[in-house]
């Protein structure tokens, strides 16, 4: 006889949400300057909430706009931290998913929550923006929406990147706004083609912070921008270093980050991080990998390398490891031994948080964390540039996030 599955949605989740709201709503207003517009609807029903991903507090912002519990689709990494993860699962029951991978179990769990009457929320980008522009949204979101058959609620967050860019540890003073952009009923999206529904989601969730006229004041405005950038418009692949409000390249190029989000430098070709980031993506997509030397393009030392057991735990393998990035592989040195991960055999490479690197390789998951200045993005971008060889269209330009 089959054992009956435990219910995913619990009454305690609503109680905990209400208690947390009393603390987190004023917290987000004070810390992030958030103006959260409450969603008021007479009908009490469940939704699939899709939001653009700008800050580490997006789930608090979204949750503050709605009554009742919201079940978030979140990175599996949040369930690998022992007691804290178990407490989180008990309190709010997030739905874990493998980043940038097809995760059937996550879809099944979402169907289960929907069947139980729960509201589900996710960021279709799958990653928090590094540039201030809404990132690539995979077409698979359309099939996901159609599978759940819930009213689709599109939620926009504006100003979050200005308040705290993904690459920064500092929170700046400015204005953040969260609001419902549109509600799409199942009867409406059932009449749309897949292309039309995808275009609608992309349009309603698209935000470009580089076009903002707001100012965001604070200390060390450019600090750790090198987590997001590793290509110099003058010398190409490079290592950048930030200090205070400035970021500099080893070639001597120096740029200042201003409170309005603009860049200031002598004859510097980009006025915003978004322009520089787009140039970096174009540069990588235009690289002729065959012309690159068979030597490390980058070497990072002093890395904490862990083995991750998805949804369960992580085990530290080396607190002083090394990673070498080649044109076609990543070589890890763990406890004195080398492990070669070719781009062909890496299933998924992704960035977690500000600068953690996860590599899914032949049934194993390696997590790599460096110092404050570590750039995980370059490993992901080069890996996908290799994998995209021969592909056309937007999929051929997708660099992992």
Regions found by a protein language model. Give the residues of each.
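Soluble catalytic domains of membrane acyltransferases
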Residues: 8-13, 17, 21, 26-197, ...
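Phosphoinositide-dependent membrane-docking surfaces
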Residues: 49, 97, 324-356
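Short amphipathic C-terminal alpha-helix that caps PH/PH-like domains
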Residues: 88, 194-209, 375-390
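A conserved mid-domain beta-alpha-beta active-site/ligand-binding segment of alpha/beta enzyme cores
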Residues: 183-184, 195-228
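Cys/His-rich short segments
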Residues: 217-269
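Short polybasic amphipathic segments
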Residues: 247, 303-305, 328-333, 355-361
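Anionic N-terminal interaction surfaces
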Residues: 265-322
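Acidic, Ser/Thr- and proline-rich intrinsically disordered linker/docking segments
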Residues: 344-401
